[in-house]
Amino acid sequence: MAVDDLKVKPMKDQPDQKSNGKKPKGLRFLSSPWWCPAAVALGVLCLGSLMTIIMLGMQLLQVSDLLKQQQANLTLQENILEGQVLAQQQAEAASQESQRELKEMIETLAKRLDEKSKKQMELNHQYLNLQEALKRMDNFSGPCPEDWLWHGKNCYLFSSGSFNWESSQEKCLSLDAQLLKINSTEDLGFIQQATSHSSFPFWMGLSRRKPDYSWLWEDGSPLMPHLFRFQGAVSQRYPSGTCAYIQKGNVFAENCILVAYSICQKKANLLRSE
């Protein structure tokens, strides 16, 4: 083969694709008459989408800021509410403490008032008793009538006339009294001292009679043992009875029909302290 045969043929010798009236397949869309409007529409769509995204992003930011602000407001309101609740709880606790202290104070005052009322009532009672005692003292002439001797709880009258025992008993009864009755060594000492300076005998309210001849006082009570000892003969018994008398502080027994002075006795009119 010759070298000339290897030379490249000029382009004109090659078949022209344009001349054949055929277009390349890859460039068919670009040459379409709808390409430009479609591109514009797509761009507008993309721009609208971008604007929508931007607007949505801005709205999202606004919503986020609003949510943050609302959250902050809620937190602030919650803190305020917690403070108010705490303050209310503290106020309730303080109120309860004040009520407790006030209740204790009222109870203390009521107790003091009750004590003062009781004391006032007691003072009023004492005042009334004092007034009553003063009234009694105004009308009080003494524990014993005139000419009577006062000793302890009793009054004693030494008679100025002599009678037998029964008549002496009647005289004492007429004075709302009885013949002398000795119940204690203290009473005995007073009578012994009162009669020690007189030589006259004085009937006592002590006698013994049938059937057992026991020594009995007018009211029927027996003589206390060892209270005093009889002087002289005491064993003799008389039909009219044996009666006791006291003379110069000593006690004797004699026939009741004999005459002697007497000692009457009755309760003293003592003021009673109430």
Curated annotation (Swiss-Prot):
Example of a GO cellular component annotation carried by this entry: extracellular region
GO MF assignments: carbohydrate binding; low-density lipoprotein particle receptor activity
Transmembrane segments: 32-54
Localization (cell): Cell membrane; Membrane raft; Secreted
Extracellular topological segments: 55-274
Lipidation positions, renumbered (S-palmitoyl cysteine): C36, C46
Coiled-coil regions, chain positions: 84-139
Ranges for region Disordered: 1-25
Residue pairs linked by disulfide bridges in the UniProt entry: C144-C155, C172-C264, C243-C256
Record's keyword annotation contains Coiled coil: yes
Keyword Glycoprotein: yes
Predominant subcellular localization, coarse grouping: membrane
Residue span of region Neck: 55-150
Glycan-linked positions: N73, N139
Free-text description of this protein's post-translational modifications in UniProt: N-glycosylated.
Complexes and interactors: Homodimer; disulfide-linked. May form a hexamer composed of 3 homodimers. Interacts with HSP70.
Function: Receptor that mediates the recognition, internalization and degradation of oxidatively modified low density lipoprotein (oxLDL) by vascular endothelial cells. OxLDL is a marker of atherosclerosis that induces vascular endothelial cell activation and dysfunction, resulting in pro-inflammatory responses, pro-oxidative conditions and apoptosis.
PANTHER family the UniProt entry points to: OXIDIZED LOW-DENSITY LIPOPROTEIN RECEPTOR 1
Domain text: The cytoplasmic region is required for subcellular sorting on the cell surface.
Protein name: Oxidized low-density lipoprotein receptor 1
